[in-house]
Amino acid sequence: AFILGRNMFGPIRGEWPDDAWKGWWGDNPPYHAPTFILTHHARAPIMMEGGTTFHFITNGIEAALAQAKAAAGDLDVKIGGGVLTVRQYLLAGAIDELHLAQSPVVLGRGESLFADIDLPGLGYRVTETVPTELATHIVLTR
């Protein structure tokens, strides 16, 4: 199962104007599993090709995590972003392993993933680094 913030699902803000928007990915999103979208605005689940069903969660990160764990069974729950969503789960101590892919590209100001978060203080340490041609993959474990 996956958990995404609303911005990762789409560009629409506020109330859903209609049911036309079904995500950035077309009819067959890359998740192929139950995917829980954090939002303040309720919406009926959307079943897509390939096994993805988007569920819209309005009662917080804990509720989304509980539903994702129930849906995943013995499999992992993956937090797919964006930055605000990952930050909330880091601060809640709900992420056991964080896989970062750092690319040498200047994208602008953006949002800071780790601003004012004491990763060592939360128990995280670097357990793996893998340099590749296009990125360095860093695994943090708690």
Q: What spans do the regions from the language model cover?
A:
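Enzymes that bind and transform nitrogen-containing heteroaromatic metabolites
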Residues: 1-142
